[in-house]
Amino acid sequence: MGKEDKQHINIVVIGHVDSGKSTTTGHLIYKCGGIDQRTIEKFEKEAAELGKGSFKYAWVLDKLKSERERGITIDIALWKFQTSKYEVTVIDAPGHRDFIKNMITGTSQADCAILIIASGTGEFEAGISKDGQTREHALLAFTLGVRQLIVALNKMDTCKWSQDRYNEIVKETSNFIKKVGYNPKSVPFVPISGFNGDNMIEASTNCPWYKGWEKETKAGKSTGKTLLEAIDAIEPPVRPTDKPLRLPLQDVYKISGIGTVPVGRVETGVIKPGMVVTFAPANVTTEVKSVEMHHQQLQAGNPGDNVGFNVKNVSVKEVRRGNVAGDSKNDPPAGCDSFNAQVIVLNHPGQVGNGYAPVLDCHTAHIACKFAELLEKIDRRTGKSVEDKPKFIKSGDAAIVKMIPSKPMCVESFTDFPPLGRFAVRDMRQTVAVGVIKSVEKNTGGSGKVTKAAQKAGKK
């Protein structure tokens, strides 16, 4: 298989602040990745000048991160690495300010999460304690539908590669991920040193007692020794090409000589030239004249593609960021009057009751929504109701809530269209809650604008 033919997968790296996420991720990208020798030499030189003589992989990631935060678009190849089967993109590593928001509205759904645990004495305990970030990140990944997990026990060199310590941590972590919702049998546990490279890409000689990881899923059993092999054993995701088209708009451009060009990422389905699309909640229907990606004309835009498409007889004022395009003949998108969602409160200083109206980030939409009614409080692991019509919910609680958007908005249920069915609740400049949409009350507000181009195309 040539480099071109590898299937793409996305991973997200989670874990406590000092677990060594950057070092581990940096190491993989450095050894198997898209960073060319020149960039590495440049980084090494800078590191030496700054007295970071022990140039290690975290530096790679810190460089990339600071550039990303300063808004310098880094060649996204820098966040990629190869396994024998996959081309892997690291879609985010926490520590980034908007990590939680990115993970939810994020440009893409992670296919697998790698949970990095620090094995040092005291470190592990801190990371996994009640209020630890580890718990929040793992819960978030599970809630948002990331069903595959790999656990890397990092910094094994700090506990002298002790087998007892390894067993103790595997046992504790298994209990911990079970509480979140994962089945430990389907999770590979890999002891590593992201700093020294043990069991990252090649099997380590420091732990003769370690016989390798194994995992068992519906698809069968797989085994291996290294973290790279565990990533290679991720089950290939099925991309939703057969679902109806949903394409949330990131921007709409007016390009002279061409016209109106909406831009966004195809989440489900396929967009093709000649298709008649409906934009919701704008309720405008028109024909797609052409589709392009990276300045090349496409015959079809598939899930995951960031495309621009040219539409006729529609002005820039009529469609905007946050609108969703879909095929007018196949379950077209519509605006909603209200929706019910399972909301998990992460960190709100007070109590949340009926009438609370924060801003929701759902796909590319950014709209204030009112918590119209707290319907029931639920056990967030089982989803079973524990209290009907609670007065308030607080941090740590999960509830089914009826939400009413303050202005027209297009969302979908999580089971039908995952990327349009999860949202972040933002207030006080942070993510205070996350939600997964259970059902949507769509508005059937009459027919909107149908352009001449659409009518013509419809007659063909």
Curated annotation (Swiss-Prot):
Looking up Gene3D superfamilies in the UniProt record yields: P-loop containing nucleotide triphosphate hydrolases, Translation factors
Q: Which segments of the protein form a coiled coil according to its record? A: none
Q: Which residues carry this modification: N6,N6,N6-trimethyllysine?
A: K80
Task: List every stretch annotated G4.
Answer: 154-157
Residues modified as N6,N6-dimethyllysine are: K3, K317
User: Which amino acids does the record list as binding GTP?
Assistant: 15-22, 92-96, 154-157
Positions carrying N,N,N-trimethylglycine are: G2
Task: PTM N6-methyllysine: list the residues.
Answer: K3, K31, K317, K391
Query: Region (G3): which ranges?
Result: 92-95
Quote the InterPro entries the UniProt record gives: EFTu-like_2 (IPR004161), G_TR_CS (IPR031157), GTP-eEF1A_C (IPR054696), P-loop_NTPase (IPR027417), T_Tr_GTP-bd_dom (IPR000795), TRAFAC_GTPase_members (IPR050100), Transl_B-barrel_sf (IPR009000), Transl_elong_EF1A/Init_IF2_C (IPR009001)
Quick one: where's region G2?
Answer: 71-75
Gene Ontology CC entries for this record: cytoplasm
Which stretches of sequence are listed as region G1?
A: 15-22
Among CDD domains, the record links this protein to: EF1_alpha (cd01883), EF1_alpha_II (cd03693), EF1_alpha_III (cd03705)
| Protein's cellular compartments | Cytoplasm
Going by the UniProt record, its keywords in alphabetical order are: Cytoplasm, Elongation factor, GTP-binding, Methylation, Nucleotide-binding, Protein biosynthesis
Q: Domain of life, per the record? A: Eukaryota
> Protein biosynthesis as a keyword?
yes
Q: Which residues form the tr-type G domain?
A: 6-241
Q: Name one Pfam family in it.
A: GTP_EFTU
User: GO molecular function of the protein, one example?
Assistant: GTP binding
Region named G5: 193-195
Q: What family is reported? A: Belongs to the TRAFAC class translation factor GTPase superfamily. Classic translation factor GTPase family. EF-Tu/EF-1A subfamily.
Question: Which NCBIfam families does the UniProt entry name for this protein?
Answer: EF-1_alpha, PRK12317.1
As for what it does, the entry says: This protein promotes the GTP-dependent binding of aminoacyl-tRNA to the A-site of ribosomes during protein biosynthesis.
Give the protein's recorded name: Elongation factor 1-alpha
Which organism is this entry from? Answer: Aspergillus oryzae (strain ATCC 42149 / RIB 40)
